[in-house]
Amino acid sequence: MALLLWVFSCSLFSLWILSFMRSQATEARHGTLAVMCDERARILQDQVKVSMNHLQALAILVSTFHHSKSPSAIDQTTFARYVERTAFERPLTSGLAYAARVTHSERELFERQQAWSIRAMNFSSKRPRAEEYAPVIFAQDAYKHVVSIDMLSGAEDRGNLLRARESGKVVLTAPFQLLNKRIGVVLTYAVYKSELPLNATVHDRIQSSIGYLGGVFDIEGHVDKLLEKLAGKEPMTVNIYDTTGESMIRMYGSSNESASGMCHVSTLDFGDPLRKHEMHCRFTQGPPWPWLAVASSYGTLVISLLVGYIFHFTDKWIAKVEDGYKATDMQMPAKDEFAATERISDMERDLKEDALFFDTTKSPSLLEISRLLNHRDPAQNVHQEEQELNLPLEAQDKLKETERKLGRMSKFITKVMKLTSASIRCLPSRFHCFNKKVWSISLLGFLLFILVIGAFDQPYNQPLGMGGEGDNNMMLKNFGFSRGRLLIDTLHGTWTKRGVQSSDTIRVDLRKMTRNNDSSGQQLKHWSSHKSSEIPAVLYVPMNGKQVIVHCNLIVDEKALVNWISNGDTDQSSKYQKETAGIQNRTDKPHLPANKSHKTTVSPWIVLLPVIMLVLLGSIIWRRCNDHRRRVQQKELELLGIMGPSRFQLQDLVAATGNFADENKLGQGGFGPVYKGYLRDQDLHVAIKVLSRRQSCQEQSAQGLREFKAEVKVMTQLRHRNIVKLVGWSDSKKQLLLVYELMAQGSLDKHLYDPEKILTWQQRYQIKFANLFNSTDKIVLDLGSALLYLHHDCEKCIVHGDIKPANVMLDVSHNAKLGDFGLARLVEHGGEPQTTQVVAGTPGYIDPEFINNRWPRTELDVYSFGIVLLEIACGKRPASRQLPNGASSLLAWVRDLYDQGKILDAADQRLNGEFNQQQMERVIVMGLCCSHQDPIQRPSIVQAMDVL
């Protein structure tokens, strides 16, 4: 029950850690989003204010130089010149317009001068023509964005103009769609006469207004690139809304806000109190998987369960030992009584014998004495060992007094010590009982836990402190600051003045900060102009044995101090956080209030140590597994060596090949070269195939090792005259070597395509009997005989997997022998083949059906045998580019000739017709049958040999 409660508690605690760390990560992520969103909102507000400042500057220019003109309307050229004068920076507005209030007579005069008409303002009530006003619109590129900026034609525009005239501030319209399909707003500002008083009332503003300026602000066009440049490490979407009405109007951003759900809203203040705007920021991706929280909770759970398991096992072991003691205690009285009875009976027998010589009637207590000497109290016997270990009386009295003072705590400590001692004694003897998986998981969890704990940034409580050093110096210690600047204010009352006024403000380098000044109770300010990358750890300030109070202002961001230091504005230091360290004497430890906003740098060893331990553990496990696998392979190869081929030492094969000299190289195989060698002790010429363990490609190296094992395993079971004999092998750490009997004539591939020497048809197929028992020159039949032996005569069916002329070797008499069993596979006779993981073979000879299903069956060898038959008969490679009529392959070309009834035209032209036509036709037809696309339609090797 206690164990289950412990597991439940550990699970709850780990879940709490997971939940807490996830909440912390979510809070930190939301804080990042808030900072990014607020920064974007501030930048957008600044952009709008730039446009507002431009309108205000233009209004001042117009009111100063043009309000007294008659008519007061401005032509395009003059207005453009005013715009250029006010555009100190490139204006962010996409178009500017000016509307002047003119009388009816002035409007008619201006229309005659400019040769175009001005739209009149529509009033709801009739007014005399002398009092009628009309807006005059002059725009600079405004026509590219809006149809017209007729700022008194609509109700909203009219209201904005009136608000701008009454307030004297820039007002905004509702967002609307521009001609370029983007969203924009119009900024409106009133133009007043230059005589407008500073403290003008609303009535004064209305009377003094002479016109209105309007600027089109393209929200999407100007802000899009700006916000894209400020995108953080994590992509986010930004939307801007006008929330003045009941429904929000989107001013910027996509309409689809589907994201992680985490959103932050920043309020935008564009300077118009009647319109409200907001910026919504969302992350486009969901929160990352909390690996740190999962690893921490998992490591805590594993370690807690391991601790609980250890204590549970210890408790069970102690209980078991106590039960054994109790059982022993129950058996001890009977054993003692039996032993005492035996001793008493022996003594009585001796006394009876002695009674013949001595008179024992006067000493009847002798038997009683013997009983007393031999009979022991069981309880006394049990606790005899404990009594021997009793402390002296004084120590016992002190121990009892301590227990009385500590009370229950002493019992708890005693019990814990007993459990710890018992667990330490029992763990070595019970170590083998622990599951290896439990220990592996526990070790991994512990390392993860250490890694997580080491990754935490621990806040420090003493970033800066003052300490005494010597009689006349005070030491300022820097415990955690690596970059930044310090403002040190030293205040004391009894220093002696040494030629420097107390009001001076000086700059000092922290590396050479020695100051002998007397402030006489006033404040002396030391300004740091430290230019190195790190602040020194120790700073000495002379104090002359007096008490000093030091105020330290920490500035982390050096860029923020550029103007502050250069201008000498000491009052700005108040915006930084102050920290005070009071020094009483030189023996006091430094103390400073904690600064939670700064954290220490994580020691790299805390992170590297678990990683190093994991690497070492993994290397040890890999080394042991590798050694075990090598020993198993060694045993297998040694067993194979007993059965047939011999195992050679590497130095013997090096000597046999002349240190693998180039002149002894016979050729290059798929996974290594082949060398010619001579074994002197056996007087035998051999061919040595080298498979290197250390190849550039790990996959090729593994394939070579598999070929080596497969070839040794198969070749030890083969005994046939048409199969190359495996003489031996060697498996050193650097190289794997296979030793074969040397075939004097080399491979069939070499003879088929030798331009100087041509294999005759008799050598290829026809049988010439030297006598009744021996035959020579039958390459086709020898190859078929080898396949017949592999498929039917062996204990297990052997699929060669790579039959081609390069693997058919010829001896002195041109007898063919099949070799290179690196891709061979053992298959049960009549059994279902197992699918192989790797498709290996030679293109042109490999069965297409095997590429699809990967079943190593005998049909695979039959297909390759058919291709070799066609190659022997036709003298052309399977994928030659010199085939007649542009045929894609040898098989397709021969099949086409067979369909045309011209099968003999496929015969090797170099034979010049010197062949038996029936035999040639038989070989070609059988080659086509064996290489049929459908494996079911192919003959078996037995049927093929019957035909051949």
From Swiss-Prot:
Listed PROSITE patterns: CHASE, PROTEIN_KINASE_DOM, PROTEIN_KINASE_ST
Top-level class of the enzyme under EC nomenclature: transferase
GO molecular function terms attached to this record: ATP binding; protein serine/threonine kinase activity
Domain of life: Eukaryota
Keyword hit for DNA-binding: no
Alphabetically ordered keywords of this record: ATP-binding, Cell membrane, Cytokinin signaling pathway, Kinase, Membrane, Nucleotide-binding, Serine/threonine-protein kinase, Transferase, Transmembrane, Transmembrane helix, Two-component regulatory system
Disordered: annotated span: 570-596
Gene Ontology CC terms, in alphabetical order: plasma membrane
SUPFAM superfamilies in the cross-refs: Protein kinase-like (PK-like)
Listed Pfam families: CHASE (PF03924), Pkinase (PF00069)
Subcellular location: Cell membrane
Segments forming domain CHASE: 70-280
GO terms under biological process: cytokinin-activated signaling pathway; phosphorelay signal transduction system
EC number: 2.7.11.-
Domain Protein kinase: 660-948
Residue positions binding ATP: L666, G667, Q668, G669, G670, F671, G672, P673, V674, K689
Tissue specificity note: Expressed in roots. Expressed in leaf blades, leaf sheaths, shoot apex, flowers and panicles.
UniProt family annotation: Belongs to the protein kinase superfamily. Ser/Thr protein kinase family.
PANTHER family per the UniProt record, alphabetical: PTHR27007
Name assigned to this protein: Probable kinase CHARK
Organism: Oryza sativa subsp. japonica
Record lineage: Eukaryota, Viridiplantae, Streptophyta, Embryophyta, Tracheophyta
